[in-house]
């Protein structure tokens, strides 16, 4: 029987508890889950690819069938094909996410019909989380511990300044 390999692509800048929840759930569905740190050419990242990989690896250390990989600058579907993945995981927080992700899934299917996109609905507690909002909260000294895994929290404050400690 063929090993079921799924890719969970994203910029993960930073990796959030919502991302972690999606990875945990995907790890129960697939033999292997590759969390692919992608480059979003329309954004200036806070964390380097190496930092993202380290933070994702630390955050998913308890999940033996999960690994983090840096994806080269190319189409996600091409990356998935290159590692033998048959599935792409996408987390859906709301209707806006669904519309956007459905369009991308359609194009990806046109590019490679052998790779299926699987949507996982966000747990209600994570449906308002976004990396952009978390960076903003951290930059102004807000407490982000309930939004990100502990390694990410420490890295955020190290990057943005530890303003929340001075309150």
UniProtKB/Swiss-Prot annotation:
It is an enzyme of class 2 (transferase). Keywords: ATP-binding, Coenzyme A biosynthesis, Cytoplasm, Magnesium, Nucleotide-binding, Nucleotidyltransferase, Transferase. It is found in: Cytoplasm. It comes from the Bacteria. GO terms for molecular function: ATP binding; pantetheine-phosphate adenylyltransferase activity. The keyword Chloroplast does not apply. Substrate binds at residues 11, 43, 76, 90. The record marks 19 as: Transition state stabilizer. Its EC number is 2.7.7.3. ATP binds at residues 11-12, 19, 91-93, 101, 126-132. HAMAP family: PPAT_bact. PANTHER family: PHOSPHOPANTETHEINE ADENYLYLTRANSFERASE (PTHR21342:SF1). Reversibly transfers an adenylyl group from ATP to 4'-phosphopantetheine, yielding dephospho-CoA (dPCoA) and pyrophosphate. Homohexamer. This is Phosphopantetheine adenylyltransferase. The gene is coaD.
């Amino acid at each position: 029987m063929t090993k079921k390999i799924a890719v969970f692509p994203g910029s993960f800048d930073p990796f959030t508890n919502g991302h972690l929840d999606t990875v945990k759930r995907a790890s129960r569905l697939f033999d292997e889950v590759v969390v692919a740190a992608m480059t979003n050419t329309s954004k200036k990242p806070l964390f380097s690819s190496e930092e993202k990989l380290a933070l994702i690896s630390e955050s998913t250390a308890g999940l033996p069938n999960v690994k983090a990989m840096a994806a080269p600058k190319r189409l996600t579907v091409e990356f998935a094909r290159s590692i033998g993945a048959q599935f792409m995981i996408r987390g859906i927080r709301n209707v806006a996410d669904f519309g956007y992700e459905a369009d991308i899934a359609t194009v990806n299917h046109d590019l490679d019909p052998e790779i299926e996109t699987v949507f996982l609905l966000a747990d209600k507690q994570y449906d308002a989380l976004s990396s952009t909002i978390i960076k903003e909260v951290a930059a102004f000294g807000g407490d982000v511990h309930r939004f990100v895994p502990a390694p990410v929290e420490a890295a955020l404050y190290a990057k943005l300044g530890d303003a929340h400690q001075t309150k």
